[in-house]
A protein has these predicted regions:
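Residue-level recognition of tetratricopeptide repeat
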Residues: 213, 247, 281-282
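A structural "domain/chain start" motif
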Residues: 1-46, 171-190, 222, 231, ...
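C-terminal/domain-edge helix-coil "capping" segments
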Residues: 1-11, 116-212, 216, 223
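Short beta-strand->alpha-helix linker/helix-N-cap micro-motif
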Residues: 9-83, 94-103, 115
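Amphipathic beta-strand/beta-sheet edge segments enriched in Tyr/Trp
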Residues: 75-145
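Structural marker of alpha-solenoid helical repeat scaffolds
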Residues: 209, 243, 276-277
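TPR alpha-solenoid repeat register
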Residues: 216, 250, 284-285
Length: 297
C-alpha cells in the first residue's frame, strides 16, 4: 500500500474515545472506573479499523479544569454535550459507562455514542477478575460490529490481564494523577519546575498489588517517563511487553524512550512494531522517526 493510499485510509477511519467510567449509584469512588477505562482504551488501541485516539490526548480540552475531571470521575458531573464535543474534537465515537463490583465480578453498562448518526447503542457486560478480564471481551467485540465498527485485529486484544481488584483500583488512582498533571501542566504552576513531577505512589502500589498486570506495568512506565526517568520507564515498559507483546501503549512508550536518548535504531524498531500491531504503514512509521532526527531549520 502506498503512503498516499494509506493516508486516504486514515481519513476514512473514525476515531473513538473511551471516557472514564463512573460508579453506579451507591458505589463509592474507588478508582476502578478509571482502571476499566484504561483497560478498554488499551483494547481499542489495537483496533485497526479506528484511528489511534487516546483520552489522555484530549483530557485538557474535555476537562479544562482539574475539578471538572475529578467531579466527573466521581459521578458528580453529567456526560458533556456529546454533539458539541464530537464536533469540536472531530471524534465520531464516544464510549461511556457505569460499573459496580460484586466480589470477583464487575458489571458494566456501556453506551457508545455515534455523533455522525446521532445515535446511542447500549450493552450490559460482566467481567471477571479471576479469568484475566477475558470473559465479556468477545461479547464486546460482537457489539462493536453491530455498532458499525467491527473489530480489526481481535487476536491482539486477547491478552490475559492479571490484575486484582486492589490493583485495578490503584491503577485508576494513578491514572487520575497522570490526567490531572496533564490538565494542570507546568504553565499553571506557581512554584518551581520540580513540582511538575508526578507522585508515583499509586502507580507503585498498583504494580505491587498486581505484578503480572500489563496495565499496571505500562502505566507505571508512563508515569516514570513523564518524570524524566527514562531508564526506569524503559524497564517498566519492557516488563509490560513481557506480559503482552502487542501492548500498544508499551510499544509507544519504548519508542519515546528511545527517541529521548537519541537511539534512532531503537525508535524505528518500536515505531514499526507499533505500526504493524495496528495494521499501519511501516514506511510511515519510518518517516515519523526520521523527522524526529532532522536538524531544525
Amino acid at each position: 500500500m502506498t503512503l498516499d493510499k494509506k493516508n486516504a485510509l486514515d481519513i476514512q477511519r473514525p476515531k473513538l474515545i473511551v471516557m472514564p467510567f463512573q460508579a453506579r449509584d451507591g458505589q463509592p469512588f474507588d478508582g476502578i472506573g478509571l482502571g476499566l477505562h484504561f483497560f478498554f482504551g488499551n483494547l481499542l488501541g489495537v483496533h485497526a479499523g479506528l484511528m489511534e485516539c487516546w483520552f489522555g490526548w484530549r483530557v485538557k480540552k474535555i476537562f479544562p479544569e482539574p475539578m471538572l475531571l475529578t467531579a466527573y470521575c466521581r459521578g458528580n458531573n453529567l456526560f458533556p454535550d456529546i454533539r458539541a464535543l464530537g464536533s469540536r474534537e472531530k471524534v465520531r465515537f464516544w464510549l461511556e459507562g457505569t460499573y459496580c463490583r460484586k466480589g470477583d465480578k464487575i458489571f458494566l453498562d456501556l453506551v457508545l455514542h455515534d455523533t455522525k448518526e446521532e445515535s446511542a447503542s447500549k450493552i450490559c457486560l460482566s467481567l471477571g477478575l479471576s479469568d484475566g478480564l477475558l470473559a465479556g471481551r468477545n461479547e464486546f467485540f460482537d457489539w462493536l460490529e453491530t455498532c458499525g465498527i467491527p473489530f480489526v485485529g481481535i487476536e491482539k486484544a486477547l491478552w490475559p490481564e492479571q490484575i486484582s481488584g486492589r490493583g485495578l483500583a490503584f491503577l485508576g488512582r494513578g491514572l487520575e494523577t497522570l490526567y490531572l498533571n496533564y490538565i494542570q501542566g507546568r504553565d499553571n504552576k506557581e512554584t518551581s519546575a520540580d513540582t511538575d513531577l508526578i507522585d508515583l505512589s499509586w502507580f507503585d502500589r498498583s504494580v505491587e498489588a498486581s505484578t503480572a498486570s500489563y496495565l499496571a506495568q505500562d502505566l507505571r512506565g508512563w508515569g516514570l517517563y513523564k518524570n524524566g526517568e527514562t531508564v526506569l520507564a524503559k524497564k517498566a515498559f519492557a516488563s509490560a511487553l513481557e506480559l503482552n507483546p502487542e501492548g500498544i501503549g508499551a510499544l509507544s512508550g519504548m519508542m519515546w524512550c528511545a527517541l529521548g536518548v537519541h537511539d534512532r535504531a531503537g525508535a524505528l524498531h518500536y515505531a514499526q512494531l507499533k505500526a504493524g500491531c495496528r495494521g499501519e504503514d511501516l514506511e510511515k512509521a519510518r518517516t515519523f522517526v526520521d523527522k524526529k532526527f532532522e536538524a531544525p531549520s
